Amino acid sequence: MKFIILTCLLAVALAKQESKDNSQEDFKQTVDVVIFPGQETVKNIPIPQMESVEAPIKNKCYQSIQTFKPPQALKGLYQYHMAKNPWGYTVNRAFPSTRTLQYNQKTMDLSMRAREKIVMSEIKKNIQDYVTKMKQYSKITWPRFVKSLQQYQKTMNPWSCYPYTLLQV
């Protein structure tokens, strides 16, 4: 072990001495050369560092992505609005809930509006009673496989539908 350490130290010492000798020879060669200064001034010309060709292209791509701003209508197009259901499964809604609608960068809070007394006709009262009765049926717990089916609903937009023609009979 001592022998290995000794040889390593000896090799390093010889390498340093050899590099000193080389640098002294270079210095002796440059001392013999005489340079007469000219009338023009010497300017420091910066040498550009070597850069890969791909770097500017990547920078341009990233800059264009960062500066691209999609229209306001397209921002929420593919966002799935998740609502946690109290019965233990998640429902994807096709449209945002009313509290998340935005108009001119300001959120609309529907609870801030003044409540007005609404006069309803008999038909509207019957419809409202029917809706409240149907809410009772929505509280029925479904089996686990039905819960998982409702999680993967896709929102519909005009670009995801296939055009079809009606058959004339």
From Swiss-Prot:
Residues in the signal sequence: 1-15
InterPro entries tied to this protein: Alpha-s2_casein, Casein, Casein_CS
Tissue specificity annotation: Mammary gland specific. Secreted in milk.
Pfam family, one: Casein
Localisation per UniProt entry: Secreted
The keyword Ribonucleoprotein is annotated on this UniProt entry: no
Protein's name according to its UniProt entry: Alpha-S2-casein-like B
Species this chain originates from: Rattus norvegicus (Rat)
Protein's gene: Csn1s2b
